[in-house]
Amino acid sequence: MLSRTQEYALRAAVFLGRSHGDGPLRTSELAKRTGIPRNYLSKILHQMVRRGLVDSERGRRGGVALSRDPAEVMLREIIAPFQPAHEPKRCVLGRPECSDEFPCGAHQSWKKIKERTEAFFETTSIADVMAETPLP
């Protein structure tokens, strides 16, 4: 359901949430601690900075930090920048025609799953995830 980029963005955001208030964290350290390839992480963080989700500081004491309190940042905000502009709607059973008007056998169930998943990302904050996730 999530792309690798979205998974990495969530992983980085949760880790930054844990260190919120401790000052900036170097990208190399964040990459090492989260297991995300450094170059890939840099591109993800660049997008997060552009969206105002992460603050970036240059220099010896520089690094990245979550821009807001983890309780105020919903997971949807983290994954949205990495959502394809036009996500093709494919039938889970592979039918060429599948819609609300012409549904396949799994259409309604799959639609409910997607709606619940979207609601989860809309209403769950980084702090919520941190509370249930052990440290890496």
What are these regions (language model features)?
Residues 32, 49-50:
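Alpha-helical residues within the helix-turn-helix
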Residues 67-136:
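Non-DNA-binding regulatory cores of transcription-related proteins
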